[in-house]
Amino acid sequence: MTLWVGILVGVVALLIGVALGFFIARKYMMSYLKKNPPINEQMLRMMMMQMGMKPSQKKINQMMKAMNNQTK
């Protein structure tokens, strides 16, 4: 009888740990993405305009492709 109780407690503790870990990781990633949003085409266009460059769609596509290749 005590063996089954031990196994049951272990399985329940494992499930609680997995669920708790999932929610903690989810909250961390949401706050991280809120503080550091991924760069999109609109942000690149604004950065280029601030640097005094005229942002053409070809240049923006090249920069997006280069950044995507860099993260792989």
UniProtKB/Swiss-Prot annotation:
The entry's keywords: Membrane, Transmembrane, Transmembrane helix
Subcellular location: Membrane
Record field: transmembrane: 4-24
Domain of life of the native organism: Bacteria
InterPro entries in the record: UPF0154
GO terms for cellular component: plasma membrane
Bilayer topology term: Single-pass membrane protein
Family as reported in the entry's similarity comment: Belongs to the UPF0154 family.
Protein name: UPF0154 protein YneF
